Amino acid sequence: MKEYAYLIYQLKDPMESNYAWMNWKTAKREFNPVHYDGVYYGHIEGNTSESVLEKLFEKFNINQPDDFKGHSLSVSDVVVLFDHNGCKWYYCDRFGWENITRDILER
C-alpha cells in the first residue's frame, strides 16, 4: 500500500454553476475549478487511486470526520489525489469517478 494525500472540493454555490449534480459527460463542457472551495484535506492509504476514491466515498458518506464541514460526497464533487507521481483530479460521477484531464483544468 502507498500513502495518498487528498483534497476534497465542493461547489461554492451550486446555483452559480450550470453543472451541479450533473454527470461528467455534461459537466465537462463548462467545468471550472474556480467554482469550487477546498473543504477537507487528509491522508489515506490504498493500493490504487480507484480503491482510494472508493474508500473516500464511503468515509465521507458513512463515517465523516468530526471536523468535516462539507456535505456527503456526491455527484459534481471533486477529489484531488497526491502521491509520489504528482496529482490527479477526479470528478464524482453518477457511477464512479472520472479523471479530469489537464486540458480541461487549464482552459
Language-model regions, residue ranges each:
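Short, conserved turn/kink motifs that form compact alpha/beta structural patches or helix kinks used as
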Residues: 33-82
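Broad hydrophobic/π-residue packing in well-ordered secondary structure
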Residues: 3, 7-11, 53, 90, ...
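Extended boundary segments
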Residues: 1-47
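Intrinsic disorder/low-complexity detector
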Residues: 15, 25, 39, 63-65, ...
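Short, compact, well-ordered microdomains
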Residues: 69-106
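Short intrinsically disordered terminal tails
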Residues: 1-2, 105-107
